[in-house]
Curated annotation (Swiss-Prot):
Main subcellular localisation: cytoplasm
Entry's Gene Ontology cellular component terms: ciliary basal body; ciliary base; cytoplasm
Family annotation (InterPro entries): C11orf97-like
Record keywords: Cell projection, Cytoplasm, Cytoskeleton
Protein name according to UniProt: Uncharacterized protein C11orf97 homolog
Biased composition (Polar residues): 102-115
Coiled coil: none
Record region (Disordered): 1-26, 100-124
Cellular localization per UniProt: Cytoplasm, Cytoskeleton, Cilium basal body
Amino acid sequence: MRRQEALVVTAGTASEASRDGEQPRPAGLVCRARVEPGGPQESRQQWKTFLYCEPHKRIKEVLEEELSIKRDECHVKSPTAVALDGIWSIRRNLPVGGMIPGQQSRNCSLPQTKYYSRHGGLRR
């Protein structure tokens, strides 16, 4: 940190602004910087005032809504169930509907030419 400037942060009010000879401003956070002796601007030790103003109420509401939407998108209640939902399914992986209880053939239990791909489902 350089010794040229020292920052002082205080809670500003309209009365502080009027004491400095400036027009009254709404309450906010005021930062003042002063040049210390020995610096390049040693002769003039003035205070520079910077006023922080909060964003408009509607802008804050919109930002809070966007933040809550992002939180909801990132929050998954059961991540393992969601992850396995697209990968493993009994309907996709096992031929349940093709088996009829009355008909049993010797070739029925042999593997078919179909195979499962997680990118495209069942293929021949």
